[in-house]
């Protein structure tokens, strides 16, 4: 079963759009390195908080992606736009309700 990697990005005030412009290509590259899916969410209550979620079959593919020359260069280009340190965390799917049909409402 695939594992999910989460990275919480906390962006400096007035820098979110520029950071997003720099970091957007990194999301596409995750797919090229073998991620099943990749998306970025933005907190409704805190628009400076972004969460990057990637789904991987193999942690080694994430490591190849994260430490690749391309992604390292993008992180360096975005260095002045986000709070450090960055930390990622791994999650496994505990329940997947997508294949379960909901019972009819009464």
Predicted regions and their residues:
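Short S/T/G/P-rich N-terminal loop/turn motif that feeds into the first structured element of a domain
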Residues: 1-72, 81-106
